[in-house]
């Protein structure tokens, strides 16, 4: 009985340390976007946090990297959005205009979201949560991509769009015994890349806050992704799709 109590205490302590570490990490990543004009220190920190990808035999590196890609995209996306808030805030100050919303408040909110992602969302492995993780990483990744798209070569922009979509689709399909997982994820990546090419020339944005712009493509892709996932899941269940299953 004492052994069980001791094990429980150690489990609680380990969970508490895990929470504290992730809160500190998320705060540090956001802080770097505030302290430096460059985005790269925060991006490097997020990348270094995935060191465990390489803490295995080299033959497992590819599989580990692909499985960690959605989390990496979400983290880089959030710090990019935080960095963008700071840059937009500076442009307001240079123009002599008052900020409608304090940039620091938005950046802290992004830090809270990142903490919740690391502590609550990322560890979950249920079908609904994995689907949400895939959708969230794609949405945040696309929003961040358009934030830094200005001045970026079109080829680089399209390659990043493909990687974001491929990683999201691969994670969502990973819940099923799909032999063509890589092929289907590649097809989705190519489709998103084509839509991104159109959006590169004709972009529409919506203001989530005055400091965060949501590209129309991110919303459209989310709607298509949810519909496609429900169709795929219904087809996997009984090889037929009904309107009730899509509802």
What are these regions (language model features)?
Residues 1-120, 241-247:
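N-terminal topogenic module of multi-pass integral membrane proteins
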Residues 49-65, 113-126, 166-180, 227-239:
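C-terminal ends of transmembrane helices
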Residues 2-34, 180, 184-186, 195-247:
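C-terminal transmembrane helix-loop-helix hairpin of multi-pass membrane proteins
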Residues 85-95, 105-150, 165-175:
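Internal transmembrane alpha-helix with an interfacial aromatic "cap," most often the third helix
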Residues 81-91, 141-153, 193-208:
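Hydrophobic alpha-helical transmembrane segments in multi-pass integral membrane proteins
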Residues 21-29, 77-83, 137-146, 163-170, ...:
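Hydrophobic, membrane-inserted alpha-helices
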Residues 39-49, 103-110, 155-166, 213-223:
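Hydrophobic core segments of alpha-helical transmembrane domains in multi-pass membrane proteins
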Residues 13-14, 18, 62-74, 120-140, ...:
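Cytoplasm-facing juxtamembrane segments at the starts of transmembrane helices
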């Amino acid at each position: 009985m004492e052994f069980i109590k001791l094990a429980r205490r150690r489990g609680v302590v380990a969970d508490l340390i895990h929470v504290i570490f992730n809160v500190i990490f998320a705060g540090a990543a956001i802080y770097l976007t505030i302290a430096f004009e460059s985005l790269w220190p925060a991006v490097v920190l997020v990348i270094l946090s995935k060191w465990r990808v390489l803490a295995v035999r080299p033959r497992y590196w590819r599989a580990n990297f692909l499985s960690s890609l959605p989390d990496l995209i979400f983290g880089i996306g959030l710090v990019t959005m935080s960095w963008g808030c700071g840059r937009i805030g500076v442009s307001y100050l240079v123009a002599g205009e008052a900020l409608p919303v304090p940039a620091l408040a938005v950046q802290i909110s992004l830090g809270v979201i990142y903490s919740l992602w690391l502590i609550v969302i990322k560890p979950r492995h249920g079908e609904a949560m994995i689907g949400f993780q895939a959708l969230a990483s794609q949405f945040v990744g696309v929003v961040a991509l358009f934030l830094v798209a200005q001045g970026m070569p079109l080829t680089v922009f399209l390659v990043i769009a493909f990687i974001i979509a491929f990683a999201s689709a691969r994670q969502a399909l990973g819940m099923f015994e799909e032999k063509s997982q890589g092929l289907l994820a590649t097809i989705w990546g190519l489709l998103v890349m084509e839509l991104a090419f159109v959006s590169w020339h004709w972009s529409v944005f919506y203001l989530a806050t005055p400091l965060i712009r949501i590209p129309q493509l991110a919303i459209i892709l989310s709607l298509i992704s949810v519909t496609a996932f429900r169709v795929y899941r219904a087809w996997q269940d009984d090889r037929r799709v009904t309107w009730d299953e899509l509802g």
